[in-house]
Curated annotation (Swiss-Prot):
PANTHER family: GLUTAMATE--TRNA LIGASE, GLUTAMATE--TRNA LIGASE, MITOCHONDRIAL-RELATED
Binding-site residues, Zn(2+): 112, 114, 139, 141
Main function: Catalyzes the attachment of glutamate to tRNA(Glu) in a two-step reaction: glutamate is first activated by ATP to form Glu-AMP and then transferred to the acceptor end of tRNA(Glu).
Stated name of the protein: Glutamate--tRNA ligase
Documented EC number(s): 6.1.1.17
Gene: gltX
Subunit details: Monomer.
Organism whose genome encodes this protein: Elusimicrobium minutum (strain Pei191)
Top class in the EC scheme: ligase
GO biological process entries: glutamyl-tRNA aminoacylation
InterPro entries the UniProt entry points to: aa-tRNA-synth_I_cd-bd, aa-tRNA-synth_I_codon-bd_sub2, aa-tRNA-synth_I_CS, aa_tRNA-synth_I_cd-bd_sf, Glu-tRNA-ligase_bac/mito, Glu/Gln-tRNA-synth, Glu/Gln-tRNA-synth_Ib_cat-dom, GluQ/Sye
Amino acid sequence: MKIRVRFAPSPTGFLHIGGVRTALFNYLFAKRYGGTFVLRIEDTDELRSTEESTQAIFDGLEWTKLLWDEGPFRDGKENGPYPPYLQSERVKAGIYQKYIDQLLEEGKAYKCYCTPEELEAMREEAAAKKLPPRYPGKCKHLTKDEQAALEAQGRKPVIRFNMPSEGSVEWADLIRGPVSFASKDLYDLVISKPSGFPTYNFACVIDDHLMEMSHIIRGEDHISNTPMQIQMYKAFGWTPPEFGHLPMIHGSDGTKLSKRHGATNVIEYQKQGYLSEALVNYLALLGWSNSESQQLFAPGELEQKFDIKGVQKSPAIFDNAKLDWMNSEYIRATPISKLTDLAIPFIKEENIDISKTDRAALENIIAIEQEKYRTLKEIPGLIKFFFEDVVFEEGAKEKVYGKPESKDVLLGITRVYQNIEPFKEADLEAATRAFAKDNGFKTGQIFHPVRVAVSGRTHGPTLFKMLELLGKETVIKRLNEAAKYSNI
């Protein structure tokens, strides 16, 4: 079988993190089996679809490196044998209308002239009788004359699919196993609007068939659409693709992931300083695991190890703490040159002037606490003291400089440092330890005041490497300043 899968988002807002996971699982499935990953833009919602949202889809997929083999591109061009890949363009090309006409001619669809008010009254009547809100088929058997009379009133019809009501619809779900819906629980869904635009359920059936999709892998929220779509495949005499429905993503409280749980727009994660590779690794584990319960994957490894059989049925819980841990692991493994490139936009965003710092020095400064960064966005705040005047942590001065020996320590170590040349880590450490020993101090009585004086922090990077990177002039200046307010 030729493996063909698709990611088919609607451009009605930002690209949701759940959408990215759906794209990822389709991408991995295609790569695992040498198949084709297709992007199709389902922009048949004339009121809500926007070009800005389409660009946001490109932004999200490009940042996460989920690059498609077929589909539209940012520049308006398309690649693939089944263009166009925007459903609005397919409407203009008349692709859907002939299939609407076919169903009408065969009695498998009908025109419905009911107004929104009439439909609401039907829903209320069904609710009063404790029946499901299923369209009762009022317009199913209208004569040509009755249709003409309604159109003379100015009514424009929708087209409804004539849903079979006998038996059941069954399929072997790739993730959930056997699934069955009673046909009596389905309804005559609208497949074409008065504008001539097809609805989601109809357009995706036509496109998935014409584009030769072998597997449809999508969220669990689509599972109720599947029996209706299968009935449409049967109406045309087509073989449906295989379906697999991914588990929902929930927040830590067990409810559907939403903004109250944190960011849901994939680009927000980019802005917050997450590495795309880390986010992709994390999303792969939201509802899937391999037999080794592996957590971290090397480049290209997910493509080799992904197996749809490893996808779970129960909802996946989005754990921000685990994502932070995973991102820190990826940051730790990133070569310092690349990490510096990634960090620079965040540094500039905080208006930290690095223009007078050469590249090698900047890399050394960023590297000094590389093992501690959880996100790129944390880097500016942790290195700011290298470039700007010290801003003391709350309580840092009182904690360190209120001690009786602090002023003598600072003045004494300043004299020691003035005589060190070159101002290097090893020499600084040796001289500091010698000063402590010679003057009867514990090393902590020296290290802590010096650290706070030069960085404003009570904890931080390796002390003597930090002093070397700050440079002799800056260190001496800051120590002298600190001595002025010692013994406060």
